[in-house]
Amino acid sequence: MPDTIVDIRGLRKRFGDNEVLKGIDLGVTRGEVIAIIGKSGSGKSTLLRCINGLETFQDGALTVDGEALKHHDAKAMRALRQHVGMIFQSFNLFPHLTVGRNVMLAPALVKQRAAKDGEAQARKLLERVGLAEKFNAMPDQLSGGQQQRVAIARALAMEPAVLLCDEITSALDPELVGEVLRVVESLADDGMTLLMVTHEMGFARKVSDRVVFMHAGRIHEMGSPAALFGNPQTPELKQFLSALHG
């Protein structure tokens, strides 16, 4: 039996009268890389924000690593966020802290990690994302691509079981996209469970085990990259892909 790490059943989410997720069913196996694609407003980012507890949902069930998501239980939510890392399109680094301190902060606060251990881990993670020499730099001294790589290192510092990436290259200049995608690809190669909302279709095709196409708040198609990109089954996916190439 596959080792399911994220299990989503019948998930529904409303903002007022607007239902943005209309019954999502999705199981994610440990080590799996899933790309979530679709037009703006299809519910992609909202789904990620539900998985790590940033958004509450009205109906359905969601478990991560065997633990049910319980919005009313603050302790359970803190534990969930230690299992689920999230990287946003805006890097959200603390501007007054050095790069190293940005990476060290959450483990120190949440896990009470000793400063010496935290520094060693931060240096190791910055080396992993190709920024070993930037430990003492300030965020405003970095390019957007470098800041996003620091944000990846910061998320990894909490040793998450699942990493959520929400359009993490969409705010970058085109020439900086590749350096961030190479880091994400290396995480996939190392067996990290990844769910990524992306507009980088070539990257999704190359790195993903499965691609999820969302349309109007539902999972409209799901399958291997070869199947979805090479043989789309619905008019909506065909139109979405043709618009990208048009």
Locations of regions flagged by a protein language model:
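C-terminal boundary and immediately downstream tail of ABC-type ATPase nucleotide-binding domains
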Residues: 215-216, 222, 226-246
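ABC family nucleotide-binding domain
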Residues: 3-225
